[in-house]
């Protein structure tokens, strides 16, 4: 990502830090994870498939600042009202991007554990997405810092055999678990 992320050379130190934290807090399960960005081209994530086994948990979500993800159109949709149509090609492309990401990675053995803030930053068909999450056993994030999932979208999602996780969207350790 252009502004966030980890450097792969930091992983050995992160593993050491996690081992130390596990020794100090044996009652807690502490995982090393990554929130990969979804893209419209295979492998549909911006983290290389060969790097994924280095993580204990894989999250995926759509974000601005990623190539091959419709950034300009989605930004204009969210901030100007352009492309606002129930059947817009942007909605179709965005939804296909998420479905392709979920199914292709599941088929490749790269299970996505959590889909983060679905519906945020562009038009997405939440019903189709939660069906795919149910099919793949992917948890759906309810995010404290983003506009989506909305209450209405949660009601739609709750009709399916999908599980939720609540995220604080912390980008620094001090914000972990902070909810409003």
What are these language model-derived features?
Residues 142-161:
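Short, motif-level signal for alpha-helix interfacial/capping segments enriched in acidic residues
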Residues 2-135:
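Extended substrate/RNA-proximal surfaces in nucleic-acid metabolism proteins
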Residues 37, 121, 146-147, 171:
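Conserved beta-strand edge residues that scaffold enzyme active sites
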Residues 66-67, 147-148, 171-175:
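Short gly/pro/ser/thr-enriched loop/turn and capping motifs at secondary-structure boundaries
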Residues 162-177:
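Short acidic/histidine-rich active-site segments
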Residues 137-147, 167-168:
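His/Asp/Glu-enriched short active-site or ligand-binding loop at hydrolase and phosphoryl-transfer sites
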């Amino acid at each position: 990502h252009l502004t966030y992320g980890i450097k792969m050379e930091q992983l050995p130190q992160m593993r050491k830090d996690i081992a130390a934290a596990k020794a100090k807090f044996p009652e807690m399960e502490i995982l090393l994870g990554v929130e990969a960005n979804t893209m419209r081209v295979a492998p549909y994530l911006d983290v290389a498939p060969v790097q994924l086994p280095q993580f204990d948990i894989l999250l995926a979500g759509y974000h601005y600042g990623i190539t091959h993800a419709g950034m300009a159109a989605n930004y204009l949709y969210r901030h100007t009202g352009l492309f606002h149509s129930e059947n817009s090609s942007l909605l179709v492309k965005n939804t296909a991007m998420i479905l392709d990401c979920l199914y292709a990675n599941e088929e490749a053995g790269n299970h996505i554990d959590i889909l983060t803030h679905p519906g945020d930053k562009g038009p997405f068909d939440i019903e189709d997405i939660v069906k795919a999450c149910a099919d793949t056993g992917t948890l759906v994030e309810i995010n404290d810092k983003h506009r989506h999932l909305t209450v209405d979208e949660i009601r739609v999602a709750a009709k399916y055999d999908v599980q939720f996780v609540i995220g604080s969207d912390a980008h620094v350790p001090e914000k972990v678990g902070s909810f409003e």
